[in-house]
């Protein structure tokens, strides 16, 4: 049994075998409280005739197709790995699975707000947990472009690394309610652990920053509905813009991504996470009462660090 840990030797061998190009990830967040639908199309090159594996942690794998040929999940999926043999020079792998919502801050975390019963989701992938949401070569040096398509209840906001597109109306998977589907633009090549999905009835305030190269960068600050009266968005956005200006001047490099959202999320198991263009912060940084100066300073340090 291979287990769920990746060794350095395995990572080195896999990097020498495959080169990742792109992932198309389709997620259905309307299937209930325990699992969500995940379909991944991974495109990659490989040494012809070679073998490797792709990572996935899922309670159910429905189907696996490699270069048009079906593979039996019972034969090729073990622990957190899907074995891939007799690879071609150019490969397309399609994996359809049910993945599990988490309550430990790994993968796609699900939280129900006791204040109003609303449900919130956010991802935390650093370092080995994007495999809990989609099939992926889970190591930072195998970068690729990611295209996310997300179906969620119609009352939800959905955020990712690329700017949020206009959603298409649809129905929930069981046809019992209204939903909408977001098709996000492909990202630049990046490591899987800095990709992100945030979904739920988050409430936000938006602004803009003019980057050093003249681009207008959209900014957003979001939190759950029950905390919005406490969110000092003006101060957070002002600090963010001053931080951008300082770092662009210091490093003589403009901001690299197309937008910059900051989402303050519940039950976060760290201070924050620098997902590309979609940063998550623990919502303890939304102060419910007048904070001491040290807490304000700590939040500022975290925002500028990310």
Language-model features, listed with the residues they occupy:
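Short alpha-helix carrying the canonical HExxH Zn2+-binding catalytic motif
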Residues: 295-306
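Acidic/His-enriched low-complexity segments
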Residues: 1-258, 284, 289, 301
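Residue-level detector of transmembrane insertion/anchoring sites
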Residues: 108, 248, 272, 295-296
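Long, charged, glycine-rich C-terminal linkers/tails
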Residues: 256-266
């Amino acid at each position: 049994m291979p287990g769920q840990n990746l060794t350095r030797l395995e990572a080195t061998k896999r990097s020498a075998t495959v080169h990742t190009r792109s992932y198309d990830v389709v997620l259905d967040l309307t299937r209930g409280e325990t699992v969500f639908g995940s379909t991944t199309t991974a495109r990659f090159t490989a040494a012809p005739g070679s073998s490797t594996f792709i990572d996935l942690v899922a309670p159910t794998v429905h189907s696996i197709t490699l270069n048009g040929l079906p593979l039996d999940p019972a034969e090729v999926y073990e622990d957190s790995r899907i074995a891939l043999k007799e690879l071609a020079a150019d490969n397309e792998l399609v994996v359809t699975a049910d993945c599990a919502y988490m309550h430990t801050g790994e993968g796609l975390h699900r939280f129900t707000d006791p204040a109003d019963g609303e449900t919130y989701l956010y991802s935390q992938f650093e370092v080995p947990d994007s495999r809990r949401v989609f099939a992926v070569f889970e190591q930072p040096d195998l970068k690729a472009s990611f295209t996310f398509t997300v179906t969620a209840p119609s009352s939800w906001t959905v955020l990712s690394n690329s700017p949020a597109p206009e959603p298409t109306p649809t129905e929930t998977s069981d046809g019992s309610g209204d939903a909408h589907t977001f098709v996000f633009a492909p990202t630049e090549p990046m490591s899987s652990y800095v990709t992100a999905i945030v979904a739920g009835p988050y409430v936000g305030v938006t602004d803009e920053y003019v980057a050093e190269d003249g681009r207008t960068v959209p900014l957003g600050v979001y939190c759950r509905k029950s905390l919005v009266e406490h969110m000092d968005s003006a101060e957070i956005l002002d600090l963010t813009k001053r931080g951008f200006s300082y770092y662009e001047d210091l490093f003589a490099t403009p901001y690299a991504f197309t937008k910059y959202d900051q989402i303050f999320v519940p039950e976060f198991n760290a201070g924050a996470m620098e997902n590309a263009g979609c940063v998550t912060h623990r919502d303890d940084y939304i102060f419910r009462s007048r904070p001491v100066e040290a807490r304000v300073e700590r939040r500022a340090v975290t925002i500028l660090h990310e």
